[in-house]
């Protein structure tokens, strides 16, 4: 049954396998009039791109092509399709995988579900994290539209393996973690993370981590009770990322250890005269609705399943127990690149709900709106460019 | 925009407010031929019912009425509607709430979204946990259908405030937590939980907790990549429960602290000759698909927001800061009753995906299937009855 | 699989069988702040009510109860549920039907699909036209919301059996067919229709007919290419009415006999300075989008299947050919009451698309909007009341 | 808001504009294991291809590429994507259109909805019938899957302008209309149609027509009451085709002129001992469900809007009335190629409902099923090949 679409008013449908000719995404529901260019999408993809230090060695240029929905540089209201060709594909690295499902991977469940004879094992096929590039590509459009409500999203790697950020961090620092090749929001943290990564690489092992995403200026009242609450849709979107095994927002699991008098927040009049909450303990969501405070959520990534260390598995040809050393080209910690994917998923959910709640016009932008979005986007890109180069 | 429906092939739509004439649910997608009675639904509701020791004092009989979709004791394929009248309603307890939004509650976000003038504040209106009775009612049908695949769901309160179960626990013990008024799976734990509850009641405070849900005999391959993965739909469903602020499955957040060589599981040949995983570290879901191992997931409940202790809020009449002591009748730990709601949500997601994957016939049950389900259900009820009475 | 919901932003889910305790509808997606009363719904239902001259003798009071989603006379944003109890039920009239499926009815297909043992034959069960009362009830809310765009819908019986209106008719005349017990838009036509009906009643037979629906002031640009075009969603909605076997808009089937130079319309500057079409040959829809001209569509109703004349069928007990004379209480021409149902379906589709295109705020109405709607609605009711009484 | 997807279990999402780099379709919900090749898709496309006698002069090779979802010649369960590059594009023919919206076309409504500045006027942009090639491509997969239930679909041009088939026609003759370049099911009809077309071409005019689609061996019980009835979903699908302005099934509009005793069918025991209907007056659908008889439906195509004859329009630069002679390369009767598109839409709806009703396994085909489908498909292609060549 279909499962490759997400969103009700801003709806993405992704397609493509790791070692097929291309991956891509159809974005349906983009209002007409938005300026959008290949460069806008490339820009967002640049923060996810493999082939950098500390991540997988696969050298994909990730060059997006917009093949529908845009005319003369602006969206037309028709479905917007982006394709990204797969260039740097070495399927031969996966020959062993064909017979020996990799522990921690989707290999065996896919075989169980779809049949061994129908399994595209090359590079993980459809279950490969390569698919997430489509999501990040689509998120460029989401982020541009969110300029209309001044919503900006920052994300960083809050913990990597045993190392966790345990001091205060500003939205600015989180946002600027784009500067860091390991998405650390503090310099000292970056060093510690890099050390862990190097050590794991040497050992042929990997680390898990926690990505934290913050969104500023989230429109008030996003979320539709009782099942399409903002927290529900965010949880679904984040759990749809490969390797994500947990989600929490606000106090999250810590709240389960607390008393009501600790976990409840105080309702106050803010300096701007508006009602709000003193400490934002709820992470910006109360009653399932955005409440005007910063959105704060985290998701747990398990360690990269592909490791060089030998692991026990079964040889499907002989049905005998065997071992495998996964050789492909893999991230020592998927959580690092996962940060930008988590950020993308939050953008996709927020823009969907901003449309659902009427904050963004569903059919077309006015000329003013289109222009303002473009100006804000230019400033955003300018601001982020040094970060892009630093990585 | 609509948000009150969940599921694609087994689709529930709930309605009703805490202090309206009734709450209810339409279940669309139930195959014809299933035996279903008011008693079946009442049975499941009995484990959630307020008015017991350690939970809210509201005395609702929770008497469900099936008003459509069943003829001569069997489903007809038409939408099945269950209504539950609200009887024990004391709206006067909420007069103060009308002007003083309760910290930690949906009050203020609902006002922000829908307008103060349209806010049904009585008993929390639509945001009340009362709505979850509709879900539990619907879950009786889900659980009966899941008898076809021998899928059984157990759930317990894994931690309450600072007290956490830190020893091995069997599926049987978890299942039998229905015996416990605080949903503890061990006797010593029950005592500790009860103590905490009593103390909180005295203090006019509340506690958070973690519910763990285990499902045995989950059909293999449930979940639809890449967005309707089983983990995604479970996360969405569980986060849609009021007061749930976190979700994890398998190793969950702990995996984020681990190395790949620790977090990966071993693929082995089981005693029955089938492929499987040695330790079920993945909690029954790999690649987003159920893998034949037990489903293991947890969700974090924040402490009950309604506490008698005075809390800071704002009086909407004067726009001045004020305090409120929430007096209604509330659970000292929503997590306790939350256990049965979490269990219900898991049942609803599993049956939806079992239908999506073809494990349950979409249109009608054969006579054999209907009879087998009924027999298994009778055994299940007999088994659980002593638990019901012990509470 | 679920099939009892319609609409994406204004979503109705109906439930209930002809001889069950009640029928009803959940309307999800109604913005908060709309004034709505039981009387508003009763008013719309009055034009569909059976128990009048020329239609079925079943005496249903059709008294709607709003059981959720409204507080203090205004919608809250929560799902709005309306129930209508079934009172005048005589199931004994259906004893013969149990074994002899009625020609032209859903009896045998329902038995084939859901199983004989699960078939609620009483009054046609779920397939009864009784279900359409839920749709008309929901359409009251749709029509009120459409007051915001001044959209008004008129409908009449364009033909009954061999008699067809073949002269010009104004929107006003069509709208005022509510005065007529047979939904005729001209006095001479009314007489002819009544004669036909009387004759059919005497013969124990029935007639088919064509309902025409016109909507004035339809917002421009409704419809979402390429599958949710306005014409597509209208066709689906109208074909979902029992006994409807055909749909056309604008020139409809006549266009298939024409040349392009005849069927094309002229694009002109209207007196108000706006672009438009000279003759509205397209019936208000071009490219699948509403184009600002009046919406004009028709649907064909087959004759009432329930007739007293003996018809050939098979006795399911003996598997031998047999005959049946259907005795229940039935309309001699379902098309008559079908007019109000067709009108309701058009309202439901238009309001859904008006929401999708941003003409109606998705979350809540402003105080001004709520007031203006109410004023216009009052005028509409006042205008229609004499029509109600005349029937 | 998204509108480019159709179907619940077999879900197509199309993208692409007439003069963009490519058009295409994602098919989500295809079970794994189906053999599928580029040739299969090309085969179906061949019956729709422009560039033949009597249809548009645009010479598109319509060469489909499968870029995802297939591995080693079989579907994998991942979304299957087909792209078709646009090669023979002459946008210069549309320069006049840019300022003079064409009567009968989507031009002006698209401008009204999405804004003049966002309008891709080249070749009709998204509203071009070119998009229907994506649907026909997807229908190849649908038709293959329907081999499992032996469902075969035939379609022919029942009338063209004033000429209508008024004698009996067999399913075989209808099916073999693929032989005819004008989709006529009788030789004498073919000649009359060709004459009409030639005359229209000379005059610079066009004709409307009616396509009739018949499906044999439709599984029993397809359709989900009360809104996703088979007739409703068919109506929606057919009305989504550009230029379709009417739909009917069975007796259709003729039933509206009849008495119940004429329109009702007789329920009988068929020669095979099964229950059925004597005359199939209902066209295979009763109560909204397929009833085991042949599906019979028709849709009305208006005449091609693009004609060389001068027509009145408005010049958008001057806002003055003007005339246009549409020069591009167009079919003299869209209904001719419309036959294959109507056939495709019926296949798409039937396969969706066959999956919804459990006739086709939702996740994967067994080896036997895959093989049987392939064998039947080969026979079907062999049978149709001479027809392909004759055109």
From Swiss-Prot, chains A, B, C, D:
Mind telling me which Pfam families this protein's record contains?
Chorismate_synt
Protein residues bound to FMN: 126-128, 287, 302-306, 329
Arranged from A to Z, the UniProt key words for this protein are:
Amino-acid biosynthesis, Aromatic amino acid biosynthesis, FAD, Flavoprotein, FMN, Lyase, NADP
> Entry cofactor note text?
Reduced FMN (FMNH(2)).
**Superkingdom of origin organism:** Archaea
What are its E.C. numbers?
4.2.3.5
User: Which Gene Ontology BP annotations are present?
Assistant: amino acid biosynthetic process; aromatic amino acid family biosynthetic process; chorismate biosynthetic process
> Which Gene Ontology CC terms are recorded?
cytosol
The pathway this protein participates in, as annotated, is:
Metabolic intermediate biosynthesis; chorismate biosynthesis; chorismate from D-erythrose 4-phosphate and phosphoenolpyruvate: step 7/7
Disulfide bridge positions per record: none
Q: Where is the signal peptide?
A: none
* CDD domains, per database record: Chorismate_synthase
- Residues annotated as binding NADP(+) are 48
Catalytically driven reaction(s): 5-O-(1-carboxyvinyl)-3-phosphoshikimate = chorismate + phosphate
A GO molecular function term, named singly, is: FMN binding
HAMAP family linked:
Chorismate_synth
The function of this protein is:
This reaction introduces a second double bond into the aromatic ring system.
Annotated protein name in UniProt: Chorismate synthase
Q: Which organism is it from?
A: Sulfolobus acidocaldarius (strain ATCC 33909 / DSM 639 / JCM 8929 / NBRC 15157 / NCIMB 11770)
């Amino acid at each position: 049954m279909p499962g490759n679409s997400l969103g009700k008013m801003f709806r993405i449908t992704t397609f493509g396998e790791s070692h097929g000719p291309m991956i891509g995404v159809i974005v349906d529901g983009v209002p007409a009039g938005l300026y959008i260019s290949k460069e806008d999408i490339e820009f967002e993809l640049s923060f996810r791109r493999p082939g950098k230090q500390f991540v997988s060695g696969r050298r994909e240029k990730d060059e997006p092509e917009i093949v529908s929905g845009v005319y003369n540089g602006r969206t037309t209201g028709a479905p917007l399709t982006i394709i990204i060709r797969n260039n740097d594909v070495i399927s031969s690295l996966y020959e062993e995988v064909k017979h020996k499902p990799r522990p921690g991977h989707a290999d065996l469940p896919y075989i169980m579900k779809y049949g061994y004879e129908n399994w595209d094992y090359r590079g993980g096929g459809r279950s490969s994290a390569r698919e997430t590039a489509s999501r990040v590509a689509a998120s460029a459009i989401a982020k541009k539209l969110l300029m209309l409500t001044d919503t900006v999203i920052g994300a960083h790697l809050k913990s990597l393996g045993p190392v966790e950020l345990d001091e205060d961090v500003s939205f600015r620092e989180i946002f600027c973690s784009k500067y860091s090749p390991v998405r650390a929001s503090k310099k000292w943290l970056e060093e510690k993370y890099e050390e862990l990564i190097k050590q794991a690489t040497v050992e042929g092992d990997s680390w898990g981590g926690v990505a934290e995403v913050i969104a500023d200026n989230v429109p008030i009242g996003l979320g539709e009770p009782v099942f399409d609450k903002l927290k529900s849709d965010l949880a679904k979107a984040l759990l749809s990322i490969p390797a994500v095994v947990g989600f929490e927002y606000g106090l999250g699991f810590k709240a389960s250890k607390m008393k009501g008098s600790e976990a409840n927040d105080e309702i106050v009049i803010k300096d701007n005269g508006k009602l709000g909450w003193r400490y934002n303990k709820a992470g910006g969501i109360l009653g399932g609705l955005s409440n005007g405070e910063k959105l704060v959520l985290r998701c747990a990534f398990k360690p990269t399943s592909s490791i060089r260390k030998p692991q026990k598995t079964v040889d499907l040809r002989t049905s005998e127990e065997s071992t495998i050393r996964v050789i492909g080209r893999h991230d020592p910690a998927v959580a690092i690149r996962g940060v930008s994917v988590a950020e993308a998923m939050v953008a996709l959910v927020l823009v969907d709900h901003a449309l659902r709640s009427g904050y963004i016009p569903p059919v077309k932008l006015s000329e003013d709106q289109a222009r303002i979005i473009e100006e804000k986007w230019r400033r955003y890109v300018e601001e982020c460019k040094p970060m892009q180069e630093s990585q």
